[in-house]
Amino acid sequence: RLTSVTGVQTCALPIWIADRYKNEPVILGYELFNEPIAPYFENMEELNGKLEDVYKKGVAAIREVDSNHIILLGGAQWNGNFKPFKDSKFDDKIMYTCHRYGGEPTQAAIQTIINFRDSVNLPMYMGEIGHNTDEWQAAFCQTMRENNIGYTFWPYKKMDGSSFVGITPPENWANIVYFSEAPRATYKEIREARPAQAMSRKAMMDFIEACKLKNCVVQEGYIRSLGMK
Protein backbone atom coordinates (compact mmCIF):
# COMPACT_ATOMS: atom_id res chain seq x y z
CA ARG A 1 0.00 0.00 0.00
CA LEU A 2 2.21 2.69 -1.33
CA THR A 3 0.33 5.61 0.18
CA SER A 4 0.44 4.38 3.76
CA VAL A 5 4.15 4.27 4.60
CA THR A 6 6.41 7.30 4.17
CA GLY A 7 9.49 5.17 3.66
CA VAL A 8 7.86 3.24 0.85
CA GLN A 9 6.72 6.49 -0.73
CA THR A 10 10.29 7.72 -0.85
CA CYS A 11 11.61 4.47 -2.30
CA ALA A 12 8.89 4.42 -4.95
CA LEU A 13 9.72 7.79 -6.43
CA PRO A 14 11.01 7.11 -9.96
CA ILE A 15 13.79 9.70 -9.87
CA TRP A 16 16.34 7.47 -11.56
CA ILE A 17 14.02 6.85 -14.52
CA ALA A 18 13.40 10.57 -14.95
CA ASP A 19 17.11 11.31 -14.75
CA ARG A 20 17.88 8.68 -17.36
CA TYR A 21 15.24 9.82 -19.86
CA LYS A 22 15.03 13.55 -19.14
CA ASN A 23 16.32 14.48 -22.60
CA GLU A 24 14.66 11.64 -24.52
CA PRO A 25 11.92 13.03 -26.83
CA VAL A 26 10.43 9.62 -27.64
CA ILE A 27 9.19 9.29 -24.03
CA LEU A 28 5.66 10.70 -23.64
CA GLY A 29 5.89 10.92 -19.88
CA TYR A 30 5.95 9.07 -16.57
CA GLU A 31 2.99 7.41 -14.86
CA LEU A 32 3.75 7.39 -11.14
CA PHE A 33 1.53 4.48 -10.04
CA ASN A 34 -0.47 1.90 -11.96
CA GLU A 35 -4.02 1.45 -10.62
CA PRO A 36 -3.31 2.66 -7.07
CA ILE A 37 -5.50 1.67 -4.11
CA ALA A 38 -7.58 -1.40 -4.94
CA PRO A 39 -11.30 -1.30 -4.09
CA TYR A 40 -10.92 -4.23 -1.69
CA PHE A 41 -8.54 -2.37 0.65
CA GLU A 42 -10.18 -2.08 4.06
CA ASN A 43 -8.92 1.51 4.47
CA MET A 44 -9.66 2.51 0.89
CA GLU A 45 -11.23 5.88 1.69
CA GLU A 46 -8.36 6.81 4.01
CA LEU A 47 -5.83 5.99 1.30
CA ASN A 48 -7.84 7.83 -1.34
CA GLY A 49 -7.53 10.94 0.78
CA LYS A 50 -3.73 10.64 0.74
CA LEU A 51 -3.27 9.86 -2.94
CA GLU A 52 -2.99 13.37 -4.32
CA ASP A 53 -0.41 14.34 -1.70
CA VAL A 54 1.71 11.32 -2.64
CA TYR A 55 1.45 12.29 -6.29
CA LYS A 56 2.59 15.81 -5.45
CA LYS A 57 5.66 14.41 -3.70
CA GLY A 58 6.43 12.22 -6.69
CA VAL A 59 6.03 15.06 -9.17
CA ALA A 60 8.25 17.33 -7.07
CA ALA A 61 10.95 14.66 -6.94
CA ILE A 62 10.88 14.17 -10.71
CA ARG A 63 11.02 17.90 -11.33
CA GLU A 64 14.35 18.01 -9.50
CA VAL A 65 15.90 16.25 -12.50
CA ASP A 66 13.38 16.53 -15.35
CA SER A 67 11.31 19.59 -16.19
CA ASN A 68 10.57 18.44 -19.74
CA HIS A 69 8.21 15.50 -19.56
CA ILE A 70 4.53 15.10 -18.85
CA ILE A 71 3.59 13.21 -15.68
CA LEU A 72 0.49 11.02 -15.80
CA LEU A 73 -1.68 10.62 -12.71
CA GLY A 74 -3.92 7.57 -12.57
CA GLY A 75 -7.19 7.54 -10.69
CA ALA A 76 -7.80 5.41 -7.61
CA GLN A 77 -9.54 2.02 -7.88
CA TRP A 78 -8.19 0.64 -11.16
CA ASN A 79 -7.50 4.16 -12.50
CA GLY A 80 -11.22 4.90 -12.50
CA ASN A 81 -11.94 7.17 -9.51
CA PHE A 82 -10.85 10.80 -9.82
CA LYS A 83 -12.78 12.18 -6.87
CA PRO A 84 -9.64 12.25 -4.65
CA PHE A 85 -8.09 14.96 -6.84
CA LYS A 86 -8.75 18.54 -5.74
CA ASP A 87 -5.72 20.42 -7.10
CA SER A 88 -4.94 20.13 -10.80
CA LYS A 89 -2.70 23.20 -10.93
CA PHE A 90 0.26 22.12 -8.80
CA ASP A 91 2.30 21.37 -11.94
CA ASP A 92 1.99 22.71 -15.47
CA LYS A 93 2.82 19.42 -17.21
CA ILE A 94 0.46 16.86 -15.72
CA MET A 95 -2.38 14.91 -17.26
CA TYR A 96 -4.71 12.20 -16.00
CA THR A 97 -5.05 8.60 -17.11
CA CYS A 98 -7.88 6.09 -16.79
CA HIS A 99 -8.44 2.39 -17.57
CA ARG A 100 -11.56 0.53 -18.69
CA TYR A 101 -12.27 -3.09 -19.60
CA GLY A 102 -16.00 -3.64 -19.15
CA GLY A 103 -19.38 -1.98 -18.95
CA GLU A 104 -21.23 -0.34 -21.80
CA PRO A 105 -19.06 1.16 -24.58
CA THR A 106 -20.95 4.44 -24.51
CA GLN A 107 -20.29 8.04 -23.58
CA ALA A 108 -22.79 7.77 -20.74
CA ALA A 109 -20.69 5.00 -19.19
CA ILE A 110 -17.62 7.24 -18.94
CA GLN A 111 -19.39 10.56 -18.45
CA THR A 112 -17.95 11.07 -14.96
CA ILE A 113 -14.44 10.73 -16.40
CA ILE A 114 -15.29 13.18 -19.18
CA ASN A 115 -16.77 15.60 -16.67
CA PHE A 116 -13.63 15.46 -14.54
CA ARG A 117 -11.44 16.00 -17.60
CA ASP A 118 -13.46 19.02 -18.62
CA SER A 119 -13.57 20.46 -15.09
CA VAL A 120 -9.78 20.52 -14.77
CA ASN A 121 -9.21 21.42 -18.42
CA LEU A 122 -6.42 18.86 -18.77
CA PRO A 123 -6.03 15.87 -21.11
CA MET A 124 -7.45 12.48 -20.15
CA TYR A 125 -5.63 9.45 -21.55
CA MET A 126 -7.21 5.98 -21.62
CA GLY A 127 -4.06 4.05 -20.83
CA GLU A 128 -5.58 0.55 -21.00
CA ILE A 129 -8.46 -0.99 -22.91
CA GLY A 130 -9.01 -4.57 -24.02
CA HIS A 131 -10.21 -7.99 -22.83
CA ASN A 132 -13.53 -7.73 -24.64
CA THR A 133 -15.23 -8.55 -27.92
CA ASP A 134 -14.16 -6.90 -31.14
CA GLU A 135 -17.61 -5.33 -31.41
CA TRP A 136 -17.39 -3.80 -27.93
CA GLN A 137 -13.92 -2.49 -28.56
CA ALA A 138 -14.84 -0.95 -31.92
CA ALA A 139 -17.78 0.86 -30.32
CA PHE A 140 -15.72 2.05 -27.36
CA CYS A 141 -12.86 3.30 -29.53
CA GLN A 142 -15.41 5.30 -31.49
CA THR A 143 -16.76 6.76 -28.23
CA MET A 144 -13.28 7.84 -27.20
CA ARG A 145 -12.50 9.38 -30.56
CA GLU A 146 -15.75 11.34 -30.42
CA ASN A 147 -14.77 12.65 -26.98
CA ASN A 148 -11.14 13.44 -27.80
CA ILE A 149 -9.69 10.80 -25.47
CA GLY A 150 -6.48 9.14 -26.60
CA TYR A 151 -6.18 5.40 -25.88
CA THR A 152 -3.89 2.40 -26.01
CA PHE A 153 -4.65 -1.32 -25.95
CA TRP A 154 -3.49 -3.93 -23.44
CA PRO A 155 -1.99 -6.37 -23.90
CA TYR A 156 -0.24 -6.78 -27.23
CA LYS A 157 0.03 -10.56 -26.93
CA LYS A 158 -1.94 -13.18 -24.98
CA MET A 159 -3.63 -16.58 -25.21
CA ASP A 160 -6.99 -15.57 -26.57
CA GLY A 161 -8.44 -13.34 -29.24
CA SER A 162 -8.47 -10.05 -27.34
CA SER A 163 -4.99 -8.93 -28.38
CA PHE A 164 -3.02 -7.99 -31.47
CA VAL A 165 -1.48 -11.43 -31.71
CA GLY A 166 -2.58 -14.65 -30.06
CA ILE A 167 -0.44 -17.35 -28.47
CA THR A 168 -1.41 -20.96 -29.21
CA PRO A 169 -1.40 -22.94 -25.93
CA PRO A 170 1.26 -25.67 -26.05
CA GLU A 171 0.66 -29.31 -25.23
CA ASN A 172 -0.08 -29.94 -21.53
CA TRP A 173 -0.59 -26.23 -20.84
CA ALA A 174 -3.93 -27.08 -19.23
CA ASN A 175 -2.00 -28.99 -16.54
CA ILE A 176 0.05 -25.88 -15.75
CA VAL A 177 -3.11 -23.81 -15.48
CA TYR A 178 -4.74 -26.41 -13.25
CA PHE A 179 -1.77 -26.40 -10.89
CA SER A 180 -1.75 -22.61 -10.67
CA GLU A 181 -5.44 -22.58 -9.74
CA ALA A 182 -5.55 -25.68 -7.53
CA PRO A 183 -6.04 -25.47 -3.74
CA ARG A 184 -2.76 -24.84 -1.92
CA ALA A 185 -3.71 -24.33 1.69
CA THR A 186 -1.42 -27.20 2.71
CA TYR A 187 1.75 -28.80 1.36
CA LYS A 188 -0.27 -31.98 0.81
CA GLU A 189 -2.62 -30.16 -1.55
CA ILE A 190 0.29 -28.64 -3.43
CA ARG A 191 2.04 -31.99 -3.83
CA GLU A 192 -1.14 -33.70 -5.03
CA ALA A 193 -1.84 -31.03 -7.65
CA ARG A 194 1.74 -30.68 -8.87
CA PRO A 195 2.28 -32.04 -12.40
CA ALA A 196 5.33 -34.09 -13.34
CA GLN A 197 8.46 -31.94 -13.41
CA ALA A 198 9.62 -33.08 -16.86
CA MET A 199 6.21 -32.39 -18.36
CA SER A 200 6.02 -28.98 -16.68
CA ARG A 201 9.44 -27.99 -17.96
CA LYS A 202 8.58 -29.05 -21.51
CA ALA A 203 5.28 -27.16 -21.37
CA MET A 204 7.03 -24.01 -20.19
CA MET A 205 9.74 -24.26 -22.84
CA ASP A 206 7.08 -24.86 -25.49
CA PHE A 207 5.23 -21.80 -24.18
CA ILE A 208 8.34 -19.66 -24.63
CA GLU A 209 8.62 -20.90 -28.20
CA ALA A 210 4.92 -20.24 -28.82
CA CYS A 211 5.36 -16.64 -27.62
CA LYS A 212 7.70 -15.81 -30.48
CA LEU A 213 5.99 -13.54 -32.97
CA LYS A 214 6.63 -15.93 -35.86
CA ASN A 215 4.55 -18.57 -34.04
CA CYS A 216 1.67 -16.29 -33.01
CA VAL A 217 -1.62 -15.76 -34.80
CA VAL A 218 -2.39 -12.21 -35.94
CA GLN A 219 -5.87 -11.25 -34.70
CA GLU A 220 -7.22 -9.29 -37.67
CA GLY A 221 -10.58 -8.56 -36.07
CA TYR A 222 -8.97 -7.09 -32.98
CA ILE A 223 -6.77 -4.82 -35.07
CA ARG A 224 -9.76 -3.59 -37.09
CA SER A 225 -11.73 -2.96 -33.89
CA LEU A 226 -9.08 -0.42 -32.86
CA GLY A 227 -9.51 1.43 -36.13
CA MET A 228 -6.13 0.22 -37.38
CA LYS A 229 -5.04 -1.71 -40.46
What kind of feature is each model-predicted range?
Residues Q9-A12, T133, N215, Q219-E220:
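General structural signal for secondary-structure boundaries
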Residues I15-K158, S163-S180:
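Extracellular glycoside hydrolase catalytic/binding regions
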Residues T143, N147-K229:
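Extended, alpha-helix-rich binding/interface surfaces that flank or overlap catalytic cores
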Residues R1-G7, C11:
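Single conserved hydrophobic/aromatic residue that forms the stacking wall/gate
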